[in-house]
């Protein structure tokens, strides 16, 4: 993958329809980008060198999607993704609270929408190599009893090296 290629082809500011189509296919639902959000999370120096692209968008239903492309996967991919997803969820919470306060409206947790963390790996972490014929891995929190509570965070990991090996 080439940094400039990905950034040019999948730039939500200039070609939102491409990012919408990709996200629609990945999330298995129609996606419309409402706006591109600023990247506010600090990145460590070595992390920045491995990230090809990192885009955060607000979707039409006000959910948040973070689309990241990495040259090589990090150690502890689940923990890292959970931390960034939690950061996005907290940013959304603060933004929604502030917006409602400005409008002099009462806050409700119902206003907080889902956060999707989507990571494409050029060279995926070793955990993904145990599943060489699978290249899309979806995660969502589920109860062991069957009760359904929306915990707002979903993850999709895409191993491009596994895909190329199929």
What is the meaning of each model-derived region?
Residues 1-166:
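Elongated, amphipathic alpha-helical interaction scaffolds
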């Amino acid at each position: 993958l080439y940094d400039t290629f990905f950034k040019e082809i999948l730039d939500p500011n200039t070609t939102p329809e491409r990012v919408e189509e990709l996200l629609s296919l990945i999330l298995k639902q129609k996606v419309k980008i409402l706006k591109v959000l600023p990247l506010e999370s600090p990145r460590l120096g070595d992390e920045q060198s491995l990230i090809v692209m990192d885009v955060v968008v607000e979707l039409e239903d006000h959910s948040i999607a973070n689309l990241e492309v990495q040259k090589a996967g990090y150690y502890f991919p689940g923990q890292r993704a959970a931390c960034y997803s939690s950061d996005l969820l907290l940013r959304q919470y603060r933004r929604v609270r502030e917006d409602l306060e400005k409008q002099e409206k009462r806050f409700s947790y119902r206003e907080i929408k889902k956060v999707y963390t989507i990571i494409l790996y050029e060279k995926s972490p070793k955990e993904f190599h145990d599943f060489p014929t699978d290249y899309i891995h979806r995660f969502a929190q589920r109860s062991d009893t069957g009760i359904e509570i929306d915990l707002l965070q979903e993850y999709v990991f895409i191993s491009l090296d596994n895909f190329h090996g199929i």
